[in-house]
């Protein structure tokens, strides 16, 4: 979202490469959130064994109060969860899957919309091949040492971890209300935010949860898990370019707009992103402050944009000229930007200092 152009032909390749890690991080954050909320999904025996069925408050203080117990939780639950997220689509690289995706001669666009039968076949091949890769390709690590007792404990522990990864991959295929949602919901979210499809539309990313809640209504995933992820990410994904109307201490709007970048998770309100400002007084800056952008000042919302459209065309042209040296080339984008592409800004190394001191 920051360094990758979001409006050219290379988007799909970059998104495909970034998606597994993006999904893995979201799965970790979602697991933490569900543990804090005391979700029934975290009461499955394997997970509960390592967090000792802690209450939400206890889980938040887990690392501080029980360093060894938390480290065990990381090794036995969190790392296997990351493995599952990273491996979830590894079966797509199986030759049979590649024949479907790319064609026998590699002549087809791998990011095209697949026919229903091809998609079903691909899902089956992916699952079988992923499990085979996990069990026969990776397997459990080998104990190195001379203690028979330690070896027995090590082998039993690693076998349980491997079975947990396998169970998560299986549960994510059709999770319904089960533990597989910890993988499935971030998978759906990532497939939209980092879409590889030709109809990818950056402007529509803040509507991602419309699709997720629709999936929940159809029984594809758990509504409560969708809601939990929504509270983590908010409506606006990290790295999204927000265009907003600044106002003074009396709440009076300025006759200009400014740019900001969504930089944090866990907004208090899902429609009020936590951002780092990228412009001040219509000039790009490399060190901005954190602000929460109220929906009443966010040009993403049509009502706010319509209200602000009372500005004259001359003033809007003036703003564009002050912000962009190539404003003539940007005219096709319109004078009233509802969002902005942050890669333009982050392509300059000095501007990457914007991340300094982010909480």
Where in the sequence are the language-model features?
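Terminal helices and disordered tails flanking the catalytic cores of nucleotide-processing hydrolases
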Residues: 1-17, 21-24, 31-52, 107-113, ...
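DG-centered beta-turn motif at the end of beta-strands
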Residues: 88-89, 187-190
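Acidic/His-rich, divalent-metal-binding segments that scaffold phosphate/diphosphate chemistry
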Residues: 1-128, 132-148
């Amino acid at each position: 979202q920051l360094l990758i152009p979001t409006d050219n032909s290379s988007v799909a390749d970059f998104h495909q490469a970034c998606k597994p890690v993006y999904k893995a991080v979201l799965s970790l954050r979602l697991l933490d959130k569900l543990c804090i909320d005391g979700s029934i999904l975290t009461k499955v025996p394997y997970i509960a064994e390592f967090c000792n069925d802690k209450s939400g408050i206890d889980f938040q203080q887990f690392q501080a109060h029980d360093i060894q117990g938390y480290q065990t939780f990381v090794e036995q639950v969190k790392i296997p969860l990351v493995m599952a997220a990273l491996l979830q689509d590894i079966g797509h690289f199986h030759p049979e899957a590649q024949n479907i995706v790319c064609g026998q001669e590699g002549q087809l666009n791998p990011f095209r919309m697949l026919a229903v039968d091809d998609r079903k076949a691909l899902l089956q091949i992916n699952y079988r091949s992923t499990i085979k890769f996990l069990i026969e390709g990776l397997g459990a690590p080998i104990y190195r040492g001379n203690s028979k007792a330690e070896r027995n404990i090590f082998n039993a522990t690693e076998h349980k971890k491997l079975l947990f990864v396998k169970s998560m991959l299986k549960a994510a295929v059709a999770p319904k209300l089960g533990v597989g949602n910890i993988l499935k919901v971030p998978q759906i979210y990532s497939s939209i935010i980092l879409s590889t499809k030709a109809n990818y539309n950056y402007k529509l990313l803040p509507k991602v949860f419309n699709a997720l809640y629709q999936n929940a209504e159809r029984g594809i995933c758990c509504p409560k898990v969708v809601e939990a992820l929504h509270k983590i990410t908010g409506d606006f994904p990290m790295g999204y370019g927000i265009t907003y109307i600044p106002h003074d201490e009396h709440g009076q709007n300025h006759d200009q707009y400014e740019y900001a970048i969504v930089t944090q998770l866990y907004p208090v309100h899902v429609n009020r992103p936590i951002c780092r400002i990228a412009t001040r007084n219509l000039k790009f800056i490399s060190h901005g402050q954190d602000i929460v952008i109220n929906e009443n000042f966010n040009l993403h919302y049509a009502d706010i944009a319509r209200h602000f459209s009372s500005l004259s065309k001359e003033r809007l042209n003036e703003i564009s000229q002050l912000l962009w040296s190539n404003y003539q080339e940007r005219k096709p984008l319109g004078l009233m930007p509802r969002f902005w592409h942050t890669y333009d800004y982050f392509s300059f190394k000095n501007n990457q200092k914007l991340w300094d001191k982010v909480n």
